[in-house]
């Protein structure tokens, strides 16, 4: 059984994510990565949201952990994603489930991919201040940090369909 504080998935390549020249986008990208890790940890370890916020904000985000430097993240954005997924999960999961291939219900998908798709679905439906293509691209990048290319294609396909459902106008403009 995996320890709660140690991810049981492929670690992201943090060397590709340099804190130099930090911009809002970098802090948001770091928040997305942290949110996916937090959602994963909550899913497999059963940790509560307040405990998870406290741990990530004091131990992971912006700190060096096991020799790896984690980028500072936009804390409010991190909290919004995690809290939003927890609050909306009963609506998000069936939405994702309907878009997955037959025989592959969400419960059968790897926990890290569930976390990526849940976070992406939440942002696409509830954070309309961020362009849909940016959201999809960012979560595909997050997925690349943990899984192989074939699995990131599934993330891209599911999130693209969700984006088109909730943000149709962004895809019909010329």
Curated annotation (Swiss-Prot):
This is Transcription antitermination protein NusB. The keyword Transcription regulation applies. Pfam families: NusB. Keywords: RNA-binding, Transcription, Transcription antitermination, Transcription regulation. One of its GO terms (cellular component) is cytosol. Belongs to the NusB family. The gene is nusB. The keyword NAD does not apply. The lineage of its organism: Bacteria, Pseudomonadati, Pseudomonadota, Alphaproteobacteria, Hyphomicrobiales. One of its GO terms (molecular function) is RNA binding. One of its GO terms (biological process) is transcription antitermination. Involved in transcription antitermination. Required for transcription of ribosomal RNA (rRNA) genes. Binds specifically to the boxA antiterminator sequence of the ribosomal RNA (rrn) operons.
